[in-house]
From Swiss-Prot:
UniProt function note: Functions as a component of the transcription regulatory histone acetylation (HAT) complex SAGA. At the promoters, SAGA is required for recruitment of the basal transcription machinery. It influences RNA polymerase II transcriptional activity through different activities such as TBP interaction and promoter selectivity, interaction with transcription activators, and chromatin modification through histone acetylation and deubiquitination. SAGA acetylates nucleosomal histone H3 to some extent (to form H3K9ac, H3K14ac, H3K18ac and H3K23ac).
Source species of the chain: Candida albicans (strain SC5314 / ATCC MYA-2876) (Yeast)
HAMAP family membership: Sgf11 (MF_03047)
Name of this protein: SAGA-associated factor 11
Subunit structure: Component of the 1.8 MDa SAGA transcription coactivator-HAT complex. SAGA is built of 5 distinct domains with specialized functions. Within the SAGA complex, SUS1, SGF11, SGF73 and UBP8 form an additional subcomplex of SAGA called the DUB module (deubiquitination module). Interacts directly with SGF73, SUS1 and UBP8.
UniProt family annotation: Belongs to the SGF11 family.
Gene3D superfamilies assigned: Classic Zinc Finger
């Protein structure tokens, strides 16, 4: 088995490739989640507008949206933010320095303290 010597260049290339792969995976998962959320939101708004045909059009420049639709969009934005917060706190990551599982919302503060103390 032939192994290549570890140099700064190979180490930097390896770290860079790992970072790029993780960023691509995270972006892909986020995009897929957003697409699923938006499609379910569209399905629910379509069913609401079909059931409520007597909606009044708000006088907001004549863009054709009802006040119910505007409220629904605002509510969905608030719900999306709360979903993101719940996902952030319910997802755990393993600290490579000390080996503990840390909640996503606390990971940045943990890793800075953990690296300061050099726990292992």
């Amino acid at each position: 088995m032939t192994s290549t010597p570890i140099t700064y260049k190979t180490l930097a290339d390896s770290i860079f490739n790992d970072l790029i792969n993780n960023i691509i995976k995270q972006h892909t998962l986020t995009s897929l989640t957003n697409i699923k959320d938006h499609s379910s939101l569209l399905n629910s708004s379509n069913s609401n507008t079909n059931s409520n045909t007597n909606g009044t059009i708000a006088s907001n420049g004549g863009n054709g949206t009802t006040s119910d639709e505007n409220n629904e969009i605002e509510n969905s934005t608030i719900q999306d933010k709360s979903k993101l917060k719940q996902l952030e706190t319910s997802r755990y990551f393993r600290c490579l320095n000390c080996g503990r599982n840390i909640a996503g919302g606390r990971f940045a503060s943990h890793i800075s303290k953990c690296l300061e103390r050099k726990r292992k």
